[in-house]
From Swiss-Prot:
It is found in: Cell outer membrane. Belongs to the alphaproteobacteria porin family. It comes from Brucella abortus biovar 1 (strain 9-941). The gene is omp2a. One of its GO terms (biological process) is monoatomic ion transport. Consists of 16-stranded beta-barrel sheets, with large surface-exposed loops, that form a transmembrane pore at the center of each barrel. The pore is partially ocluded by a peptide loop that folds into the pore lumen. This is Porin Omp2a. Forms passive diffusion pores that allow small molecular weight hydrophilic materials across the outer membrane. Residues 1-22 form the signal peptide. Monomer. InterPro entries: Porin_alphabac (IPR003684). The pore formed by Omp2a is larger than the one formed by Omp2b. Omp2b pores have optimal permeability to allow growth and protection against harmful compounds. The larger pore formed by Omp2a may be advantageous for intracellular growth, when the bacterium is competing with the host cell for nutrients whose concentration is particularly low within the phagosome.
Amino acid sequence: MNIKSLLLGSAAALVAASGAQAADAIVAPEPEAVEYVRVCDAYGAGYFYIPGTETCLRVHGYVRYDVKGGDDVYSGTDRNGWDKGARFALMFNTNSETELGTLGTYTQLRFNYTSNNSRHDGQYGDFSDDRDVADGGVSTGKIAYTFTGGNGFSAVIALEQGGEDVDNDYTIDGYMPHVVGGLKYAGGWGSIAGVVAYDSVIEEWATKVRGDVNITDRFSVWLQGAYSSAATPNQNYGQWGGDWAVWGGAKFIAPEKATFNLQAAHDDWGKTAVTANVAYQLVPGFTITPEVSYTKFGGEWKDTVAEDNAWGGIVRFQRSF
């Protein structure tokens, strides 16, 4: 009897204690709903919605390493050894729809290291040494508006502040910005575009017209012509020699990971440049590009260089993300 009463009493005590704990329990608040990042496919691959907004953001960039040998195809001087360079670039694109159209921003951050203090390689197209005959400045802050007609036609107007190149500063020195306007028509066959730019620092203008033709889905060619009212390379938009310059090129995309590129250029002062390369995608996101360039300094360019001919080569390793 005593043992049985003790067991029942212990059980009653446990029930009472459990009841007391249940009565005093703290009710946890409901967790807030988790808003997962949503993919935004309206502007191409890689965009996502910034949480809580209707703005689409893309973050992308690359890391590259260059090894150069032979002559400097810009100045005609002998490198006397290997030149090396590295760059990390991070780009941010934002886009959102408004009653006036798409509102977009673009920002690029670059961190460079070069053994020869050169920063102007690989600014255009599919080439590393693609500015043997330069066509204009490559970096600026700007405000631009682009009209897209929906039928392949587009137009752009921009106000630019200019920027620094390797040896020159093309930044505006007053309240008047550089002004740029352009038209473009694109279709399945290719595209044609023209642009006119006014340099407010030297008060001169330059214009360029380019056409691209897709011969097949793997082979394409292009041609560009330019004219400047100031016959000097020391300007923002017409950095070739003389009044005019012409460029042309071709691209072939091979079935197995390789793209072949060829480009040639000539300007009014007599400089001729040819560049060829093969961009080989070893794995997705990683490309190795060996390239060779030749520049002939003729006419008025002879007085500015040590040698009339320059041969140079470069191998680029680039990881894009």
